[in-house]
A protein has these predicted regions:
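Intrinsically disordered, low-complexity, basic-enriched segments
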Residues: 1-32, 36-78
Length: 78
């Protein structure tokens, strides 16, 4: 899947959870959605894209930071 599409998707998810929530709560909810709903391949690609992608909004960026922190060890082991 193209990086731009994944970035757009995670931004949309973050926007949804960010409406009416604190940024940290919204980032956690975004992360949980991604872990529940995205295929392993999509999560691995998002980890490779990383939180430095300039297209990420603040909540999405934090969610990707959390994703990298939680998914990176399984990437190495798998």
């Amino acid at each position: 899947m193209q990086a731009e599409l994944l970035v757009r998707m995670i931004n949309q998810i973050a926007d949804f959870y960010g409406s009416g929530s604190e940024a940290d709560v919204a980032a956690q909810e975004t992360l949980m959605h991604v872990k529940r709903m995205w295929a392993d391949r999509m999560r691995r690609q998002m980890v490779e894209i990383g939180p430095a992608d300039p297209g990420l909004g603040p909540v999405a960026r934090r969610a990707v930071e959390l994703l990298v922190a939680t998914d990176a060890p399984s990437r190495v082991a798998g």
